[in-house]
């Protein structure tokens, strides 16, 4: 289901959400998270949440240290493993520079551009997840 920012904010207020994990992937496929409190969610949707990208391998070191995470409300999920009271939610994020330009090493932006370029050439994609256990 696709949620709007307003629906996410309402859900967080009504459902005893303790914090929200803003997720993104490095260029090496490693998932990273920045946790925010529910009180920071409106600001996250409006302006993004700053993080120190110099600590993320492949993001360019100190040259590109100040980047912003922009949560995508359509990716909202509840993480199932919190043992205490209160819920933990997660959203995947797009990454931008403070001036609003998309960060060129943001894997979500790279994928979106590739899908758009392929679509312009008449190619369509179908994506899915597969669970495997060994």
Label every PLM stretch briefly.
Residues 1-134:
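ATP/Mg2+-dependent ligation/transfer catalytic cores
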């Amino acid at each position: 289901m696709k949620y709007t920012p307003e629906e996410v904010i309402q859900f967080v207020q009504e459902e005893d959400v303790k914090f929200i994990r803003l997720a993104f992937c490095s260029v090496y496929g490693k998932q990273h998270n920045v946790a925010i409190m529910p009180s920071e969610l409106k600001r996250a949707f409006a302006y993004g949440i700053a993080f120190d990208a110099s600590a993320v391998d492949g993001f360019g070191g100190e040259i590109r240290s100040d980047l912003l995470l922009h949560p995508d409300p359509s990716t909202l999920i509840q993480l199932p493993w919190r043992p205490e009271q209160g819920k933990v939610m997660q959203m995947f994020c797009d990454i931008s520079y403070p001036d609003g330009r998309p960060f060129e090493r943001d894997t979500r932006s790279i994928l979106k551009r590739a899908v758009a370029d392929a679509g312009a050439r008449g190619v369509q994609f179908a994506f899915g997840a597969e669970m495997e256990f060994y």
